[in-house]
Amino acid sequence: METGAAELYDQALLGILQHVGNVQDFLRVLFGFLYRKTDFYRLLRHPSDRMGFPPGAAQALVLQVFKTFDHMARQDDEKRRQELEEKIRRKEEEEAKTVSAAAAEKEPVPVPVQEIEIDSTTELDGHQEVEKVQPPGPVKEMAHGSQEAEAPGAVAGAAEVPREPPILPRIQEQFQKNPDSYNGAVRENYTWSQDYTDLEVRVPVPKHVVKGKQVSVALSSSSIRVAMLEENGERVLMEGKLTHKINTESSLWSLEPGKCVLVNLSKVGEYWWNAILEGEEPIDIDKINKERSMATVDEEEQAVLDRLTFDYHQKLQGKPQSHELKVHEMLKKGWDAEGSPFRGQRFDPAMFNISPGAVQF
């Protein structure tokens, strides 16, 4: 979908968001609609089934859409950073020019060299003559000597000139601008990207390849093979040994008709890969974005993040935080209980000072 077409729905979606009040409930509305009105959550278990998705395909589809806009957001961040660096660079250049101009105005004008006539008596072929000695000769010789003396300094000065960045980091910057090679690379027969837990490999296919039965994909824990079926057999598009192990049970592939075979590989360990295949030119993992995507956070970590976010907003508004609300709820239950000395009195949360460490979540 084009960006302009997607923006046509902004007003309707904005109305929903304003009505529910937060992103979490907004997403519940969207996925609830998919659950009630579509076959999005229906599993395609048999070849004869005409509705639904294969196991894991719907989740992979959602993750792919998230990654697309996550890449766009990272590109926006990178663009803003580059614009800021460009402004700083221009400002520094202008300041340097101003300082140079001021220094040039204060620099003293050199005194012109004058001819000096020296009388000397020299025996040359038995004759005496007065020679007119002019400094230009010696001056040139001294100048030549000074050039030789200044040569080491010139070399040292040249060493201070910033060199161009190495080719590899510059290439990685280009990879980062492409969602298909974000945190990965573009190779001759395929393109790959990665996040904290998964890798995505795109293997281009000809336009006439539009059905899954026209390709063959074989995945093992340590290897990958992608081939295209032809009349005379198979044409291998990508094949090799993986640089790290993958989880084949949660890895899957699909065909984008006439475009590419899309292979999603699930990492066994949570670490960054510098290459997909052994023998492939490695990328510099120090030049990639190592921030962990929210999509890779499990439910327990997500709950903690949600609680911290809630507490932050409550604190800004001067309202009770989650640990205080939990204790208040417990106190309210016993406030008016039979035999309570506080029964009949108004419950005032301000009477209690509760530290965060006093509550277990």
From Swiss-Prot:
| Low complexity bias locations | 148-158
Q: Which organism is it from?
A: Homo sapiens (Human)
Which Gene3D superfamilies did the record assign? 2.60.40.790
Q: Which CDD domains match?
A: p23_NUDCD3_like (cd06495)
**Bias-annotated ranges (Basic and acidic residues):** 87-97
Q: What is this protein called?
A: NudC domain-containing protein 3
* Renumbered residue ranges of the record's region Disordered: 87-106, 124-158
Supply one GO CC term from the record: cytoplasmic dynein complex
Alphabetically sorted, this entry's keywords are: Phosphoprotein
Q: In its keyword annotation, does this UniProt entry include Phosphoprotein?
A: yes
* Signal peptide (from-to): none
Q: Which residues carry this modification: Phosphoserine?
A: 146, 340, 355
Q: Name one GO biological process term.
A: protein folding
List, alphabetically, the Pfam families matched.
Answer: CS (PF04969), Nudc_N (PF14050)
**GO terms for molecular function, please?**
unfolded protein binding
Task: Tell me the ranges covered by the CS domain, including all copies.
Answer: 185-277
